Regions:
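Single-residue signature of alpha-solenoid repeat helices
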Residues: 14, 52, 86, 120, ...
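Conserved structural position within tetratricopeptide repeats
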Residues: 27, 57-61, 91-95, 125-129, ...
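Register position in tetratricopeptide repeats
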Residues: 45, 79-80, 113-114, 146-148, ...
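TPR-repeat structural position
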Residues: 49, 83, 117, 150-151, ...
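Short coil turns that delineate tetratricopeptide repeat
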Residues: 30, 64, 98, 132, ...
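Start-of-helix register in tetratricopeptide repeats
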Residues: 34, 68, 102, 136, ...
Length: 262
């Protein structure tokens, strides 16, 4: 039987972790939980979700009462596509903090990704009925609407952005849309960030991804170039840019051009 990739969420103390944007991060066990939370947040903001997962987990080794770290840990598992593991760890967290609304939201999102919409809906509705609604809870509610092809997703995601002005909210909303292949909607959310943060290389990378999926090859190349100009060691942008240049054509873009002429 295959061993799950993040079954135990334990990492070696002396492990070097590459950020993909600068020099490797040396994991130092002498740092406290607040340091690792800050590291997790910084890595999350530039799309290094596996590093962020490691740092959330590291912070919990120091203080298992950090609900923010439990929530972040499950969110990163979801973004890494580890949906069964996300369910497992959200349930473990809820054993420690029963009925915490953000932890209920993490389980709801994991259940949604697995395809159990009934359970996902029950969990997120329960979370939203409690005090202290958060942007994340509304993002999960919005994701459930997207997954079920309902038309209230925009309301939910707009509500999330009202509750939090953090640029991470529209960027991670874009990741939700990308997961469900709603590329134009993802592009719109990234665009909101770029209006205020034109120097965000992660936003440029996501914009390039959206444009590539929409068949806007020339625009995607420009976006990836801008990402690399701002962050020369951005490996994912380099790979995507190379693929676009070497591929020479994109079937989605080809059909778009044909239909424009007809």
């Amino acid at each position: 039987m295959a061993v799950a990739r993040f079954d135990k969420l334990e990492f070696d103390d002396a492990e070097d972790i590459s950020t993909g944007s600068s020099t490797p991060v040396q994991v130092n066990a002498e740092k406290d939980e607040r340091y690792w939370l800050a590291m997790a947040d910084s890595q999350r903001r530039v799309g290094n979700h596996e590093n962020a997962l490691r740092f959330y987990s590291r912070s919990l080794e120091f203080d298992k009462s950090l609900i923010l770290a439990w929530v972040g840990q499950v969110q990163m598992l979801i973004l890494l596509g580890e949906f069964p593991q996300a369910c497992t760890w959200s349930k473990k967290a809820l054993e420690l903090f029963p009925n915490n609304p953000d932890l209920l939201a993490t389980q709801s999102q994991a259940e949604c990704r697995i395809g159990d919409f009934k359970q996902s809906n029950a969990l997120i509705e329960g979370a939203l009925r409690m005090r202290g609604e958060s942007a994340y809870q509304w993002q999960v509610r919005g994701e459930l609407m997207v997954a079920q092809k309902q038309k209230t997703d925009r309301y939910c995601f707009d509500k999330a952005q009202i509750l939090s002005k953090d640029s991470l909210v529209p960027l991670e909303t874009a990741l939700i849309y990308l997961h469900y292949r709603e590329f134009a909607k993802a592009q719109q959310r990234v665009g909101l960030v770029m209006e205020k943060q034109s120097d965000s290389y992660y936003a440029w990378y996501l914009m390039g991804w959206c444009q590539e999926k929409l068949g806007l090859t020339a625009a995607a190349i420009r976006s990836y170039r801008q990402c690399i100009e701002l962050c020369p060691n951005h490996h994912e942008a380099q790979i995507r840019l190379t693929q676009l240049r070497s591929g020479g054509w994109n079937i989605t873009g080809m059909f778009r051009r044909i239909f424009r002429r007809s």
